[in-house]
Regions:
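Aromatic-anchored glycine-rich loop motif in surface-exposed flexible loops
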Residues: 1-83, 94-111
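An aromatic- and glycine-enriched ligand-binding surface/loop that stacks and positions planar moieties
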Residues: 32, 61-68, 80-214
């Protein structure tokens, strides 16, 4: 049997995933029903009206703050949900919700933005060193042990793989970066391409990638 601390930890893991799913739905639909227990095909809650955005957003934040307080600092082992993972989701959710409220003239924007700032500082203080090779964050067979990686998807032969090689074997890849995405990267001097004296120009891709911060 589990003691109270272990129960609170696993409840926190459940709250994390519920908050993650609700965050995705909130960004799509705004108002939606908030459900706190398992439903069956006969549950009357399937026909509930939508709850206001304020209620859903506050419940998401409440779940995440409970998880932050009660989850094991290092999770249940390597690459599991731990306190830093929860704080990262608090940061991302509150940045989204706070800016949405700010630019749509909704109340309580500052509350979410301040939570974003607080949680972000906690994560930054824990991960003080980042991996120096940006490309390896996307091309490595495993992200285990790489500085700055908070949570990653781990692949295993015959268990969990992906179809990346199939998608990039043709002349026209389905997942190439757009020109806007490439242009959004700063130059090595910290300035955007329009303000940098180190930008190589648009003559070819080699010039575009020269002296960029990646």
């Amino acid at each position: 049997s589990m003691n109270d601390a272990e129960k609170a930890h696993w409840r926190s893991v459940g709250y994390f995933f519920r908050a993650y799913k609700y965050f995705k739905m909130l960004s799509l639909y705004g108002d939606l029903p908030w459900v706190e227990h398992t439903l069956s095909e006969d549950s009357e809650e399937l026909y509930l009206p939508r709850d206001p955005r304020d209620v859903v957003a506050q419940n998401i934040l409440n779940n995440l703050k409970y998880a932050e307080e009660h989850i094991k600092v290092d999770g249940d082992g390597n690459n599991t949900i731990n306190r830093a993972v929860v704080q990262s989701l608090i940061s991302r959710f509150c940045l989204f919700e706070g800016t949405w409220r700010k630019y749509h003239a909704l109340p309580n924007a500052t509350t979410y933005l301040e939570e974003c700032t607080r949680a972000s500082k906690e994560v930054m203080n824990k991960y003080t060193t980042l991996h120096p090779n940006y490309e390896e964050l996307f091309n490595s067979e495993s992200l285990a042990g790489i500085n700055g990686i908070i949570l990653y998807k781990e692949y295993a032969t015959s268990q969990l793989c992906h179809g990346l090689t199939r998608m990039v074997r043709t002349g026209e890849s389905q997942i190439e970066a757009t020109k806007d995405a490439v242009d959004s990267y700063l130059c090595s001097d910290g300035h955007p391409i329009k303000n940098s004296t180190t930008y190589g120009g648009d003559k070819d891709v080699y010039a575009q990638f020269r002296n960029r911060d990646y």
